[in-house]
């Protein structure tokens, strides 16, 4: 019986000590930045006819404090610029999390650009590249995405 205690007690002690190690897999997810971060998911189609087809840009967003979107329809969130023109196309987005909360959010946004035009009406085709950025309610601007070229046909 004494041998059993001598062998059993150290085994139990080692087991208890090793089970007290912090399990890093249960650590909370690191907090995302309060500045929005965006990634390009897709752009479709890659060829459009001027004044006929729409272009759909799908972007993934992450925002650490969840303040993307405005209740007021005249406050813009998404800014889309065609490299052929010095014009910014702004888009409104409703709040993506409840107002007054501070939660980390992530998701996808679809931005639809209707009726792309040709810069030169005599052109047989043009290549358009777009830049996209977001603005949150704290006036933080995201990184800027640059899309692959889209062919615009007459």
Locations of regions flagged by a protein language model:
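Bacterial Sec-dependent N-terminal signal peptides
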Residues: 14-38
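Small/flexible residues
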Residues: 7, 23-24, 86
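Sec-dependent bacterial lipoprotein signal peptides
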Residues: 1-20
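First exposed extracellular module after export/assembly in secreted or surface-exposed proteins
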Residues: 31-154
């Amino acid at each position: 019986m004494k041998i059993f205690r001598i062998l059993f007690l150290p085994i139990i002690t080692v087991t208890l000590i090793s089970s007290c190690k912090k399990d890093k897999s249960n650590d909370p997810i690191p907090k995302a930045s309060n500045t929005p971060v965006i990634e390009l998911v897709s752009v479709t189609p890659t060829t459009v006819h001027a004044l006929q087809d729409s272009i759909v840009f799908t972007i993934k967003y992450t925002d650490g404090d969840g303040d993307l979107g405005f209740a007021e329809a005249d406050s813009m969130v998404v800014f889309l610029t065609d490299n052929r023109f010095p014009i910014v196309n702004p888009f409104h987005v409703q709040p993506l999390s409840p107002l007054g909360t501070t939660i980390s959010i992530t998701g996808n946004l679809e931005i639809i650009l209707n009726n792309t035009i040709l810069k030169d009406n005599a052109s047989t085709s043009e290549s358009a590249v777009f830049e996209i950025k977001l603005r949150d309610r704290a006036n933080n601007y995201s990184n800027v995405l640059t899309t692959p070229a889209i062919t615009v046909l007459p």
